């Protein structure tokens, strides 16, 4: 099945700003998050689709490639992976030479010097981390294990079986590029024999298969700043895939996702919570104690508080990761109807109800307003 357009997935236009893309992603991620839809396979698939779209459109380089070439511009299958014979340059390596010759520039961040093989920056790596709302609010330090490439201990990193040597590629003579004529056009392409390395290994290392490196894992310390929001990324420079032909390594991006909280719902730096209160407290008023991410807080509830009333507690939200200022906590109170009443309690409520209605409508203004609106239906 063909992939949907990434802009369509997020519900934004192709000219959407970074903030608009992030806002749309945050809204959809909260809607389809697996923690909120534990038994929905459809929601899980939509969450993955939304996450993939955001990963592409929030990265300036990937977004530019997608805008110009569509899904082909960001499809990792367009070039071989690390372990295969096609190298690991990705889309830029596959098309950089052709478009570079036509437009007079090198695409994809490659560099060439002295006619030798072209060097490419290593691919970036992504790591998804899930943390609690408390960890997001207060900051967090975590250890993660990520892919790492070490020099092969069998061939000491040169890719050749011990006792043999690495030779200059006989096809491109070490340049890593070959010139191909097609009609009136002459274009440079990556050498099909050495795949751009400029080298030829007659007897590849039996352990690393000529790559010179072995994939392993390493542990990194990640510092998550206080106030980080859903979908934000932390960059660890130089911890991506290794470069090709002497190019610099890529970066590691740690994408942070925040678990759904049983009490609070986050909106930027603000927090929202639903709080049930008794009928007596709503009618008579009183002080309420409410939880916050930094302990308990007390606020006054005035007399005659109606269900659905919202109270704002300034500075009780999350300290902004960029602004440094805390958001607010919004407490939405819901008047709870008592259940499992005894007969004596029911009699008391009936007496109370009669006494309230004997005084006219001044005790129930919303009820009277509603009756005034619908009385024509009963006449």
Curated annotation (Swiss-Prot):
Chain intervals annotated as zinc finger (CR-type): 139-217
Subcellular location per the Swiss-Prot or TrEMBL entry: Cytoplasm
UniProt-listed InterPro entries: DnaJ, DnaJ_C, DnaJ_domain, DnaJ_domain_CS, HSP40/DnaJ_pept-bd, HSP_DnaJ_Cys-rich_dom, HSP_DnaJ_Cys-rich_dom_sf, J_dom_sf
Record's signal peptide: none
J domain: residues covered: 5-70
A Pfam family per the record: DnaJ
Residues involved in Zn(2+) 1 binding: 152, 155, 205, 208
Cofactors, names only: Zn(2+)
A cellular component term, taken from the record's GO annotations: cytoplasm
UniProt CXXCXGXG motif repeat ranges: 152-159, 169-176, 191-198, 205-212
Main location: cytoplasm
SUPFAM superfamilies: Chaperone J-domain (SSF46565), DnaJ/Hsp40 cysteine-rich domain (SSF57938), HSP40/DnaJ peptide-binding domain (SSF49493)
Keywords, ordered alphabetically: Chaperone, Cytoplasm, DNA replication, Metal-binding, Repeat, Stress response, Zinc, Zinc-finger
Organism superkingdom: Bacteria
Biological processes annotated in GO: chaperone cofactor-dependent protein refolding; DNA replication; protein refolding; response to heat
Binding residues annotated for Zn(2+) 2, in chain numbering: 169, 172, 191, 194
HAMAP family the UniProt entry points to: DnaJ
Similarity comment: family membership: Belongs to the DnaJ family.
NCBIfam families, per the entry: DnaJ_bact, PRK10767.1
Subunit relationships: Homodimer.
Name used for this protein in its record: Chaperone protein DnaJ
Source organism: Cupriavidus pinatubonensis (strain JMP 134 / LMG 1197) (Cupriavidus necator (strain JMP 134))
Lineage, highest ranks first: Bacteria, Pseudomonadati, Pseudomonadota, Betaproteobacteria, Burkholderiales
């Amino acid at each position: 099945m063909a992939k949907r357009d990434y802009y369509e997935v997020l519900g934004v236009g192709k000219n959407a700003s970074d903030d608009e893309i992030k806002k749309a992603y945050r809204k959809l991620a909260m809607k389809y998050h697996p923690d909120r839809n534990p038994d929905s396979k459809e929601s899980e698939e939509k969450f993955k689709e939304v996450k993939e779209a955001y990963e592409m459109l929030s990265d300036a380089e990937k977004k530019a490639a997608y805008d110009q070439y569509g899904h082909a511009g960001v499809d990792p299958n367009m070039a071989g992976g690390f372990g295969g014979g096609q190298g690991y340059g990705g889309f830029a390596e596959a098309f950089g030479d052709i478009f570079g010759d036509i437009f007079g520039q090198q695409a994809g961040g490659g560099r060439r010097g002295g006619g030798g093989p072209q060097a490419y920056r290593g691919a970036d790596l992504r790591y998804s981390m899930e943390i609690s709302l408390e960890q997001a609010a207060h900051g967090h330090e975590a250890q993660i294990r990520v892919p790492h490439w070490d020099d092969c201990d069998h061939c000491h990193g040169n890719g050749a079986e011990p006792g043999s040597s690495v030779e200059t590629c006989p096809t491109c003579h070490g340049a890593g590029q070959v010139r191909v004529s097609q009609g009136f056009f002459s274009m440079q392409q990556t050498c099909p024999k050495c795949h751009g390395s400029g080298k030829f290994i007659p007897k590849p290392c039996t352990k690393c298969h000529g790559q010179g490196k072995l994939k392993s894992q390493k542990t990194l310390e990640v510092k998550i700043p206080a106030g980080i929001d859903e979908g934000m990324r932390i960059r660890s420079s130089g911890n991506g895939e290794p470069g090709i032909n002497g190019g610099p390594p890529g970066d590691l991006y740690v994408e942070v996702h925040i678990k759904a909280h049983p009490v609070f719902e986050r909106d930027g730096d603000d927090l929202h919570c639903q709080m049930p209160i008794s009928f007596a407290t709503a009618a008579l008023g009183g002080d309420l104690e409410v939880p916050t991410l930094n302990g308990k807080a007390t606020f006054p509830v005035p007399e005659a508080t109606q269900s659905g009333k919202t109270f704002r507690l300034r500075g009780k939200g999350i300290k902004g990761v960029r602004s440094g200022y805390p958001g607010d906590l919004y407490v939405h109170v819901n008047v709870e109807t008592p259940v499992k009443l005894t007969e004596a309690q029911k009699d008391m409520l009936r007496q109370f109800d009669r006494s309230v209605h004997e005084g006219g409508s001044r005790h129930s203004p919303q009820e009277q307003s509603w009756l005034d609106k619908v009385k024509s239906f009963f006449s």
